[in-house]
């Protein structure tokens, strides 16, 4: 991360810390890795809330924010460096990199999560986490709280309240910063270019997936590595199916083509729908 973005993420964490109750901990889990086939995963996309607060894009990670802590207010649990796995799957930041590059006060191995979290959460009154995230973090939190309860004789006090982080973060993300608006405009500009390219390329006899390819090319050429959602490219009757995604029929002379497609650029999505004649000529 450059210094500007590093500061932006830090400011977001501070703003969030001001919005939660005293004696609270904030837990945000990374998105899950999704297998495509036995030895290949789908392209990884970080959880939006996780990225918004850290800029960290690796899987198998967890953010812990403790606003009232004297020393370790922001902790990242992440994967260890592993030369063999990195040769196969790419570079890993590791704990040292998480501190130096992402501004964590400390970073620990994700393998030590279950061992360390009960101690880090003991004495905290409130735990905030996303109740809508499909990460299974709620089960983990219940496990950590039970581990704390087992040590109450040693003076450990378990958290009293589990609270939803969703509404607080959504309210924060609703108000866009200047650089966010620039990224949104960039996403819209790329999508505009893609729609113009498709309108110029469409011709009777093309298949819907070939027209879709014009969009994917324009997205990738401009640094938007994926569409924001499954593109809808339908000609004729298919254009009347609200969420048509097969995109495998021939585009015929005299038909209208409807395309609902937008790119995602650095976690910001665009969404544009246009309808135009397959033969390039509107009727009078």
Where are these regions (language model features)?
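C-terminal helix-coil-helix/basic helical segment that borders enzyme active sites and/or dimer interfaces
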Residues: 196-206
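Short, well-ordered alpha-helical packing segments
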Residues: 17, 33, 185, 192, ...
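Short amphipathic alpha-helical leader/targeting segments
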Residues: 69, 198, 268-269
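Short catalytic-site patches enriched in acidic/histidine residues
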Residues: 38-44, 146-151, 163-170, 175, ...
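N-terminal accessory scaffold of Fe(II)-dependent oxygenases
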Residues: 125-128, 203-204, 211
